[in-house]
């Protein structure tokens, strides 16, 4: 059910860090309520790209996405970037009105740069604000390192796992760092 207070969490896996030269190879979304309770998990989509595109990945991306099985899923996928974008928007329309939720995640500005370059309709679905968990991580590192260090991430570098970790990390900071 649509609610303007719901939050949209997104994570992208890419072939690199430059949106002008690299591409999105996996995306996932989760919608939570304002108290960070998961309401729905959206589609987890491996986006097809040619072997030529995948061959341009640097060593870190080649190793990481190869070890996780993502590279093979991308090769086997028949979903285009446009189809992935449309499927994700269709999911989000069920839960959050356009322009209401900030884009939520970890280091989310990087994901937003890729969306702006490769999926403009999806990027414009979000409010212009960002809810970036990495901001709290940086503040905790400076003001309460024990709080930051007490949260351990698994870092599978798969989109859905990364979103779940981002939500859990924000829940951790809410409980142990933000005083209200």
Curated annotation (Swiss-Prot):
Classification via CDD domains: Orn
Subcellular location: Cytoplasm
Any one of the GO BP annotations: DNA metabolic process
Active site per the UniProt annotation: 128
Pfam families: RNase_T (PF00929)
EC number in record: 3.1.15.-
Taxonomy, superkingdom: Bacteria
PANTHER family in the record: OLIGORIBONUCLEASE, MITOCHONDRIAL
HAMAP family membership: Oligoribonuclease
Protein name (database record): Oligoribonuclease
Annotated organism of origin: Pseudomonas fluorescens (strain Pf0-1)
UniProt gene name: orn
